[in-house]
């Protein structure tokens, strides 16, 4: 018989971060030639006390589409624009943290000059390589332009990687820019080796984030969500690994569930969501962090967890739909797998949720609609 569960709830969100995450609407206009054009947009958010001072940084995230690149050998008449290729699939590409931008509104027009190549490769998994060929000066201070390329699992940033085949050259065209200003003290993404570490001497603490999802009744996404409460709408559960706690060797001291639950309470955890490396869970420990958990937070008690790392499918759904964090639970489990299967979960339900920063609003742009119900984008220039 499987072990039973108990949990600890967290009541409100991390200050300076939202419990609502907003997505972009889609707008189409016609040019003088009568062709449909997808309106490019920029979203600017400021978190906490971030401003244009030296203490603030800026996260840049981009959303757009992948299409076949224009051939280098095509012939064109004078004044003729290159023929636009058909859009293959939607894509998100985070540029990461960078300097504080004084005039972010100008970045939208410079985004047209960015040239990004997209190629498939393979290791233990199918992978996608994004490489920069041309970058305007205003973007060069961000992480991705500094590195010049990034290699990720194919399902992490691309909606339908199966549409990319060997042979053609593909490019990524930016349609939406998302800039988030935040204090530099909040910049800390937990290294992957630390997140993957397991030990028999440890107990693992995970966070379960319950989100209310905003989508229409006929949306195909509803089939992947929890729909047992029609009055409150569909929900989704996302888990992230928060930290490990050392069991201890003192033979007299009792290291039971109550002991570890008390450790959770002492950390005074709070949770929010923002668009940083894509939709990102922000965790703030306002209280005492155990020594064994200190590697999972920066010196100010912050830790950022991109949903694209924890649940790529859920992250891609949040490109086009809204969400609101309604509940956060801390889960205590055995760290190594043998302890995990032999002991029940302990669940702590008192995690704070920032009421001002808990939602991701609904978007009219939905790259997940079936072709028969999707607006005709074949004639749209991107």
From Swiss-Prot:
Keywords: Viral envelope protein, Viral matrix protein, Virion. It is found in: Virion. One of its GO terms (biological process) is virion assembly. InterPro entries: Matrix_C (IPR042539), Matrix_N (IPR042540), Matrix_Paramyxo_C (IPR055413), Matrix_Paramyxo_N (IPR000982). It comes from the Viruses. GO terms for cellular component: viral envelope. The keyword Transmembrane helix does not apply. GO terms for molecular function: structural constituent of virion. Belongs to the morbillivirus/respirovirus/rubulavirus M protein family. The M protein has a crucial role in virus assembly and interacts with the RNP complex as well as with the viral membrane. This is Matrix protein.
């Amino acid at each position: 018989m499987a072990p039973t569960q108990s949990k600890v709830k967290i009541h409100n969100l991390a200050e300076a971060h939202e419990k609502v995450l907003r997505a972009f609407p889609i707008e189409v206009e016609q040019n003088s030639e009568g062709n449909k054009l997808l309106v490019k947009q920029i979203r600017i958010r400021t978190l906490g006390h971030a401003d244009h001072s030296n203490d603030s940084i800026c996260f840049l995230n981009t959303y757009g589409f992948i299409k076949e690149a224009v051939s280098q050998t095509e012939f064109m008449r004078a004044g003729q624009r290159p023929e636009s290729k058909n859009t293959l699939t939607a894509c998100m590409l985070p540029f990461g943290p960078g300097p504080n931008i004084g005039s972010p509104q100008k970045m939208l027009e410079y985004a047209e000059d960015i040239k990004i190549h997209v190629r498939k490769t393979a290791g233990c998994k199918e992978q996608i390589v994004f490489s920069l060929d041309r970058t305007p000066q205003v973007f060069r201070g961000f992480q991705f332009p500094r590195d010049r390329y990034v290699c990720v699992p194919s399902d992490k940033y691309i909606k339908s990687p199966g549409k990319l085949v060997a042979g053609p050259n593909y490019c990524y065209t930016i349609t939406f820019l998302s800039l988030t200003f935040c204090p530099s003290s909040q910049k800390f993404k937990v290294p992957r080796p630390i997140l993957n570490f397991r030990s028999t001497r440890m107990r693992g603490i995970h966070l379960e984030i319950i989100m209310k999802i905003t989508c229409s009744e006929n949306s195909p996404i509803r089939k992947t969500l929890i729909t047992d409460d029609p009055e409150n709408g569909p929900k989704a559960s996302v888990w992230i690994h928060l930290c490990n706690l050392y069991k201890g060797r003192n033979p007299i001291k009792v290291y039971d569930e109550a002991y570890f639950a008390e450790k959770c309470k002492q950390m005074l955890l709070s949770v929010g969501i923002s668009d940083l490396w894509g939709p990102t869970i922000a965790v703030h420990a306002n209280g005492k962090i155990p020594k064994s958990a200190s590697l999972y937070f920066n010196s100010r008690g912050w830790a950022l967890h991109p949903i694209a790392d924890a649940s790529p499918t859920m992250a891609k759904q949040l490109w086009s739909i809204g969400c609101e964090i309604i509940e956060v639970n801390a889960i205590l489990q055995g760290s190594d797998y043998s302890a995990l299967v032999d002991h029940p979960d302990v669940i702590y339900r008192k995690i704070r949720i920032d009421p001002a920063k808990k939602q991701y609003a609904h978007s009219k742009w939905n790259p997940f609609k079936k072709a028969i119900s999707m607006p005709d984008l074949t004639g749209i220039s991107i």
